[in-house]
């Protein structure tokens, strides 16, 4: 079997799909994208195609190593996201060729179901509470919420009090009937992160995500040492070499590699195994589309240290398309009591509505994250 063609489709809301075709008619799908930089990743995918077209798709490891090591400069979000989508599509082809789900190729199931959690946004506590109520009605009991707005390197007690008040209202409204993680989104610098984490402890969040940026990872063990709340990070780490450093330094209780940013299934399977040796949990980052989610689930079902899976159903970013809009076999993604179950179709287990993908790709827009500024005009982290 030989790879004959690679086609990309940028799609609403902010996704990109990759179709890899073969001379035997087997097609694989991947989701290579960086939110807000889809065109850059698209260019990288097509640049890398010269190493892929004409190759045997079964040689996933060799293709991955060629894409990663074939250039003197490597790593980073654009290249690793391009590799990730190609890798996902190759696993999809291999599973389809052999007639088995990808998790069977990775050693088989280690669990029967995986808990899903849902992101809940809202500018007011009442909006967040209403969003949680709606999701609990369909079986969710675990959520992720924004931990704070933008915050200066040294900021006021008023900012801290405002962030804590929101969390307090949510905990008061639901008690221990729900669990929620708090995402600082890398908006907070270390001095304020120390204060904010301490003030949030009475409300027992499930985890604190990205309390500081990955570039400031030396603070993860320092912050972890001062709190009993698990620290999570990893969506802006792009290879096992990035994770090697933070795992060796300690501090993280949960790693969150993104299967569409961190080299795909091949790389994230290794990252998960490496984390297990440090007794660190896995919770793949996934605010993206159905192919990315399927890739995450295949790793979740073979990694013993996987604890829960993010998914983007109803997320506020999904303007113009929902999670399963481009999927034919929607029922295969059905959750029961807030859990996903193994996908049973060969490959990634996602049947893509290609006709709709082609049509909607004509309506793609260039999504950009907001640019926030402090009152003094300086750019803030979003």
From Swiss-Prot:
The keyword Metal-binding is assigned to this record: yes
MF-aspect GO terms: galactonate dehydratase activity; magnesium ion binding
Pfam families membership: MR_MLE_C (PF13378), MR_MLE_N (PF02746)
Site entry (Transition state stabilizer), positions: 310
Superkingdom: Bacteria
Site annotation Increases basicity of active site His: residues: 258
Active site: 185 (proton donor), 285 (proton acceptor)
Cofactor requirement: Mg(2+)
Protein's pathway: Carbohydrate acid metabolism; D-galactonate degradation; D-glyceraldehyde 3-phosphate and pyruvate from D-galactonate: step 1/3
GO biological process, one term: amino acid catabolic process
RNA-binding listed as a keyword: no
EC number: 4.2.1.6
Catalytic activity field: D-galactonate = 2-dehydro-3-deoxy-D-galactonate + H2O
EC main group: lyase
InterPro entries: DgoD-like, Enolase-like_C_sf, Enolase-like_N, Enolase_C-like, Galactonate_deHydtase, Mandel_Rmase/mucon_lact_enz_CS, Mandelate_racemase_C, Mandelate_racemase_N_dom
Residues that coordinate or bind Mg(2+): 183, 209, 235
Cofactor comment text: Binds 1 Mg(2+) ion per subunit.
Keywords, ordered alphabetically: Lyase, Magnesium, Metal-binding
Residues that span the membrane, as ranges: none
Family, per entry: Belongs to the mandelate racemase/muconate lactonizing enzyme family. GalD subfamily.
Function: Catalyzes the dehydration of D-galactonate to 2-keto-3-deoxy-D-galactonate.
HAMAP family xrefs: Galacton_dehydrat
Note: Reaction proceeds via an anti dehydration.
Name used for this protein in its record: D-galactonate dehydratase
Lineage of the species this protein comes from: Bacteria, Pseudomonadati, Pseudomonadota, Gammaproteobacteria, Enterobacterales
Gene name of this polypeptide: dgoD
């Amino acid at each position: 079997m030989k790879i004959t063609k690679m086609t990309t489709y940028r799609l609403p809301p902010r996704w990109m799909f990759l179709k890899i075709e073969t001379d035997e008619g087997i097609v694989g799908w991947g989701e290579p994208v960086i939110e807000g930089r889809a065109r850059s990743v698209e260019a990288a995918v097509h640049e890398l195609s010269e190493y892929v077209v004409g190759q045997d798709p079964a040689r996933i490891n060799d293709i991955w190593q060629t894409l990663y090591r074939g250039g003197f400069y490597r790593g980073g979000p654009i290249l690793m996201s391009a590799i990730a989508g190609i890798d996902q599509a190759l696993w999809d082809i291999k599973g389809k060729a052999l007639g088995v789900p990808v998790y069977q190729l990775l050693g088989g199931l280690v669990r029967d179901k995986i808990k899903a959690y849902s992101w809940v946004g809202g500018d007011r506590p009442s909006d967040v509470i209403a969003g949680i109520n709606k999701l609990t009605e369909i079986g969710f009991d675990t959520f992720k919420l924004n931990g704070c707005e933008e915050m200066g390197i040294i900021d006021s007690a008023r900012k801290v009090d405002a962030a804590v008040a929101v969390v307090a209202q949510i905990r008061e409204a639901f008690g221990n009937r729900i669990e929620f993680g708090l995402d600082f989104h890398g908006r907070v610098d270390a001095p304020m992160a120390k204060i904010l984490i301490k003030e949030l402890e009475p409300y027992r969040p499930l985890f604190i995500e990205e309390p500081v940026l990955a570039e400031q990872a030396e603070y993860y063990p320092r912050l972890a040492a001062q709190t009993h709340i698990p620290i999570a990070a990893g969506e802006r780490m792009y290879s096992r070499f990035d994770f090697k450093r933070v795992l060796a330094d300690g501090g993280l209780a949960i790693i969150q590699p993104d299967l569409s940013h961190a080299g795909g299934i091949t790389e994230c399977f290794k990252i998960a195994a490496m984390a297990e040796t440090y007794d660190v949990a896995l919770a793949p980052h996934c605010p993206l589309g159905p192919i990315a989610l399927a890739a995450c689930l295949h790793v979740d079902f073979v990694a013993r240290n996987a604890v829960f899976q993010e998914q983007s159903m109803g997320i506020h970013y999904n303007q113009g398309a929902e999670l399963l809009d481009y999927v034919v076999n929607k029922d295969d993604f059905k959750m029961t009591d807030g859990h996903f179950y193994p996908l049973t179709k060969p490959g990634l287990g996602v049947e893509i509505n290609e006709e709709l993908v082609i049509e909607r790709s004509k309506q793609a827009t260039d999504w950009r994250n907001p640019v926030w500024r402090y009152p003094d005009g300086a750019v803030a982290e979003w």
